[in-house]
Amino acid sequence: ISASIAEICWAFQISIVLSNFASGLAAHTTYKMALLIVPLAIVAECFSWACISIENRLYCTCEESIWTVIFLIAFLGHIYLYKRVGYENPPTSLGIGYFGYSIFLFLCIIAQLLQVVLYVTRYIEDTQNNVKYKGFIQGFELLHSCKTISKNIDDWGDDAAWMTGYFSICVWSSIWLTIPPRMPNTGSGLL
């Protein structure tokens, strides 16, 4: 549950940064797109919990696809606003340029697309192996009970690399977003 809350809060931070830039430049369409980010994140997390409970990777594919759309909205919005401000005087924060934040969002899109491919592949393998999925009630009952905790790398090694990178980037970018890049003459940049 805490990871879902953290991801929704992270989406909220991304939404705040984009909506603040958009409102500062009177970019109404971009502002409205920024407002879609948090509801999309909530829907994505619902798909995540559906995947976890019934173990159907198609739900994970939907979750990661929605996150891809979230990062695409943020990326395109920031590139549009960056071009609107001009290249001569881009806003900066903590020594990282606004354009750097857009590159970060682009890398998030690539990472999410890789996750979509991963889960589609797992779904296809499950389909080929005639995997029988749990029902929602059975899945939620299983979630309610404690599963066996494993320290065996064979059980979680396939996900270790992406999870380490993903959660490290999420934490550091969340810290960085507390003082986001700001537009000239629009305030302190604090959330």
Model-derived regions: residue spans:
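Small-residue hotspots
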Residues: 6, 67-68, 109
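Internal transmembrane alpha-helix with an interfacial aromatic "cap," most often the third helix
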Residues: 2-34, 42-52, 77-85
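Short helix-loop boundary/capping segments
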Residues: 40-104
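Generic recognition of cysteine residues
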Residues: 9, 46, 51, 60-62, ...
